[in-house]
Amino acid sequence: MLKLVDLEKKINSELTTKIRNSEIKHNQIYVEIEKDNLMDVVLFLKTNKNTRFSQLIDITVVDYPEESQRFKVVYLFLSHEFNQRLILNYSINENEVINSLTSVFPSANWMEREVFDMYGVIFKNHPDLRRILTDYNFEGHPLRKDFPLTGHTEVRYNEEEKKVVSEPVKLEQNYRNFDY
């Protein structure tokens, strides 16, 4: 079993041209790559006898609206065999399409759907990329920092029409303090 420092060196030596940066923090390896290298890096991490990161724990996104590359896509991997964790990330522009990991990790399916639903990141070659947490007619992506806290519409049951209706949000402004 490789120590964490040796494992980081091994990954860097094998993937020299594909890794932008790596470091060890909080007893985990953090690796930054370019988005075009995702599949090569993930396949290496999963199949190499010295790494064996066989479980994809999570996929998430961090929104930096002020940056030129607005989103940082973050993948968390676990090697059961070596009891190690690795966090892989890369940055993308708002409208970039990225590769789906569902062909390598079938568990990525719902994780990628959640990222699509909450942030609007589109995954190429995903077998079923549709909303998973919000309604199909929901407007916007609620975890983006530019999404209004109250949302765009209010959904409620209308007793007179005997059905669920969607209306623009109406908020009283009388008691709000706009002096930031």
Residue locations for each model-derived region?
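Terminal low-complexity/charged segments
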Residues: 1-180
